[in-house]
């Protein structure tokens, strides 16, 4: 039997590109959807039949009621956030969530001391804030690398955890009390959380790597769902204004426990303009009424944090870096409709550097990006509405010209165009599973 085709969906900018909708749409054809990195620091918003659902940890395929969903080892899991999300889905009438959700035993857990340290550190930074969501993601990844993490498998034996926990809290409380003048975390409080969640989470703990490899051998298509965006990647993003995990397509292999040869197609999700949340350099950021208009029409507020997103022109030079480090096979352009009515559109095709030189690709690291001045190409916009358009031919001529120019400058084909939040409001030029 020929192996099935598998697709990785990643955010190709600074996150918030609209991955959730596209994963939900692609899930129709999948035998499993897998989260492979990140935590509950970013929300994936789905709109089905006008009904809105925000997921943070659970893969966006969960609304398809016969579909198995997986949380791989690369994800840091807040047990309380996970159960809260399951309860929300149950209340919304989604069937058999706990029966269909499988969690790798090797997932590090986010516990109260991670959140306490994350928030205390950010408060101490003053003007040097990184823009963390304060949900404990960074400290949980630190524990993983320092080999002191409490992992999902530990929930199967909570009675053995106390000794391990005492050693961890000694480390955390020294920092909380002496570096940040914050309250210490009590072992009893952490154990209370662990005991509360262990019984419900234990049945979901599964050898995710093995199940995914078996599904692949059986010819089932798999969908790997990235969180955040490539330009927030811990290695290749605008460091230190980045997230704590690898957000690239290659991370799907390690974070889900599958070989890289199982990743057949990389779909990069790309907004028709650029946004960024929190601190960090943003060469094409707009501070005028055009930027304010994009924010308003695009509802640019974080689905989890409620934070306003910064808006700017499309940055093809930044996207080039993303295409390079992810091996993007095709792009899905989202929120094209938000550009309706913008009279003149700028596309950033490169940057001027402080030494007078030029580059056509985003440099690595925050200091280098901070000094970049965008070089723009100008195109005429369109007045007609693209909202809800379902065929490429029905798009305004200038909208098609805009998409074509993005392809030419970035060097990757447009496979899908999203013209609204509902899964039906989608134009398909090339299906990733085809």
Swiss-Prot record:
Top EC category: ligase
Residues engaged in binding GTP: 15-21, 43-45, 309, 335-337, 418-420
Entry's Gene Ontology molecular function annotations: adenylosuccinate synthase activity; GTP binding; magnesium ion binding
Binding site residues for Mg(2+): 16, 43
A Pfam family recorded for this sequence: Adenylsucc_synt
Localization terms from the record: Cytoplasm
Reaction it catalyzes: IMP + L-aspartate + GTP = N(6)-(1,2-dicarboxyethyl)-AMP + GDP + phosphate + 2 H(+)
Keywords: Cytoplasm, GTP-binding, Ligase, Magnesium, Metal-binding, Nucleotide-binding, Purine biosynthesis
Cofactor binding note from Swiss-Prot or TrEMBL: Binds 1 Mg(2+) ion per subunit.
Main location group: cytoplasm
Domain of life: Bacteria
Pathway(s) per entry: Purine metabolism; AMP biosynthesis via de novo pathway; AMP from IMP: step 1/2
Gene Ontology, cellular component aspect: cytoplasm
Active site: 16 (proton acceptor), 44 (proton donor)
EC number(s) on file: 6.3.4.4
Cofactor: Mg(2+)
PROSITE patterns xref list: ADENYLOSUCCIN_SYN_1, ADENYLOSUCCIN_SYN_2
Biological function: Plays an important role in the de novo pathway of purine nucleotide biosynthesis. Catalyzes the first committed step in the biosynthesis of AMP from IMP.
Family to which this protein belongs: Belongs to the adenylosuccinate synthetase family.
Name recorded for this polypeptide: Adenylosuccinate synthetase
């Amino acid at each position: 039997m020929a192996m099935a085709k598998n697709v990785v969906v990643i955010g190709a900018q600074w996150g918030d590109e609209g991955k959730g909708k596209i994963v939900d749409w692609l899930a129709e054809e999948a035998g499993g959807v897998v989260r492979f990195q990140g935590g509950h620091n970013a929300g994936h918003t789905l709109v089905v039949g006008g009904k809105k659902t925000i997921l943070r940890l659970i893969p966006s395929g969960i609304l398809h009621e016969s579909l198995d969903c997986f949380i791989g080892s690369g994800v840091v899991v807040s047990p309380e956030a996970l159960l809260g999300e399951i309860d929300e889905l149950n209340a919304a009438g989604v069937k058999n969530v706990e029966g269909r959700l499988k969690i790798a035993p090797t997932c590090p857990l986010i516990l109260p001391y991670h959140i306490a340290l994350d928030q205390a550190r950010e408060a101490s930074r003053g003007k040097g804030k990184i823009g963390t969501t304060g949900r404990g993601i960074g400290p949980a990844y630190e524990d993983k690398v320092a080999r002191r993490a409490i992992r999902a498998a530990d929930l199967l034996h909570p009675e053995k955890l106390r000794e391990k926990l005492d050693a961890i809290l000694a480390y955390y409380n020294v920092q909380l009390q002496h570096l940040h003048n914050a309250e210490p975390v009590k072992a009893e409080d952490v154990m209370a959380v662990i005991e509360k969640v262990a019984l419900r989470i234990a049945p979901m703990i599964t050898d995710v790597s093995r199940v995914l490899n078996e599904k692949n051998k059986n010819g089932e298509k798999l969908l790997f769902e990235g969180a955040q965006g490539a330009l927030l990647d811990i290695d290749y993003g605008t460091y230190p204004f980045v997230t704590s995990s690898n957000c690239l397509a290659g991370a799907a292999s390690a974070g889900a426990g599958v070989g890289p040869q199982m990743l057949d197609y990389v779909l990069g999700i790309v907004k028709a303009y650029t946004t960024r949340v929190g601190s960090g350099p943003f060469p094409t950021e707009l501070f005028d009424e055009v930027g304010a208009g994009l924010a308003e029409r695009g509802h640019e507020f974080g689905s989890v944090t409620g934070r306003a997103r910064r808006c700017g022109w499309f940055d093809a030079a930044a996207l080039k870096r993303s295409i390079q480090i992810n091996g993007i096979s095709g792009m899905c352009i989202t929120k094209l409709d938000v550009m309706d009515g913008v009279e003149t559109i700028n596309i950033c095709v490169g940057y001027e550097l402080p030494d007078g030189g030029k580059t056509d690709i985003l440099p690595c690291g925050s200091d280098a990006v901070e000094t970049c001045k965008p070089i723009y190409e100008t195109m005429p916009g369109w007045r007609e509405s693209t909202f809800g358009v379902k065929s490429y031919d029905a798009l305004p001529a200038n909208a098609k010209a805009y998409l074509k120019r993005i392809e030419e400058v970035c060097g990757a084909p447009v496979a899908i165009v999203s013209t609204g939040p509902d899964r039906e409001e989608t134009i398909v030029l090339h299906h990733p599973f085809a």
